[in-house]
């Protein structure tokens, strides 16, 4: 059973495939979630009609609050950064004024972005996350959730802290088997090693299951 000891509002920066899927589940579970995205049509759709998850895993629409970076106000203790790797530095600089002094940023992304984030907000305010689920942004307010997979969170210095355990509990609203690890770097590097083998699929224009 998920028992959260800290239910502070969650800011999700990047409401595409990764952020949109996680945010929808957290909102449906009753968590206070605010989505931030650069695409104004997507923000408008979420505010007006909610965020829809569809596909083989689940089908639902949930009310959710959203804002563009320029319209965002306030400071948050829990920030999930869900942008593409190449946008990490710019997004972290943009969210930094909205990060509480005792808050943290979780890199819920593909790639190794934790050091970039730590260089901007500080290592003590940076948390790593391994995700491998399948999802796609299909348009304003519309996310396709294709496949569940492992979700792991961990401090970048390997400690199993109370905030990590609480973050794990929060994410269990999305993935019931989410875990906290003292070796988040091992998970991140293993995914990078796996992805390095996928060049062959690109060369022959094949699907992953081929």
Where in the sequence are the language-model features?
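Rossmann-like NAD(P)(H) cofactor-binding subdomain of soluble oxidoreductases
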Residues: 36, 60-142
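Internal alpha-helical scaffold of NAD(P)-dependent oxidoreductase catalytic cores
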Residues: 98, 120-125, 138, 142-210
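Nucleotide donor/acceptor-binding cores
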Residues: 8, 77, 149
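Short phosphate-engaging motifs
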Residues: 42, 87, 113, 159-163, ...
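NAD(P)+-binding Rossmann beta1-loop-alpha1 motif at the extreme N-terminus of oxidoreductases
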Residues: 2-55
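Active-site-adjacent segment of FAD-dependent monooxygenases/related oxidoreductases
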Residues: 56-63, 154-158
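Residues at the starts of beta-strands that form the adenosine-phosphate
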Residues: 9, 32-34, 104, 125, ...
């Amino acid at each position: 059973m998920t028992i959260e000891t800290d239910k502070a509002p969650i800011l999700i920066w990047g409401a595409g495939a990764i952020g949109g899927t996680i945010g929808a589940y957290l909102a449906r579970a009753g968590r206070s979630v605010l989505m931030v995205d650069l695409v104004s049509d997507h923000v408008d759709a979420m505010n007006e009609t909610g965020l829809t998850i569809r596909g083989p895993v689940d089908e639902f629409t949930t009310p959710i609050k959203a804002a563009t970076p320029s319209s965002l106000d306030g400071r948050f203790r829990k920030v999930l950064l869900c942008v593409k790797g190449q946008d990490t530095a710019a997004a972290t600089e943009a969210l930094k004024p909205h990060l509480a002094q005792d808050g943290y940023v979780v890199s819920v992304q593909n790639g190794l972005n934790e050091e970039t984030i730590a260089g901007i907000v500080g290592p003590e305010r940076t948390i790593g996350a391994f995700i491998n689920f399948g999802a796609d942004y299909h348009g304003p307010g519309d996310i396709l959730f294709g496949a569940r997979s492992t979700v792991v969170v961990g401090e970048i210095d390997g400690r199993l802290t109370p905030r990590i355990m609480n973050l794990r509990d929060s994410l269990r609203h999305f993935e019931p088997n989410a875990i906290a690890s003292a070796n988040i770097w091992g998970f991140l590097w293993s995914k990078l090693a796996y992805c390095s083998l996928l060049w062959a699929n690109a060369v022959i224009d094949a699907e992953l299951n081929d």
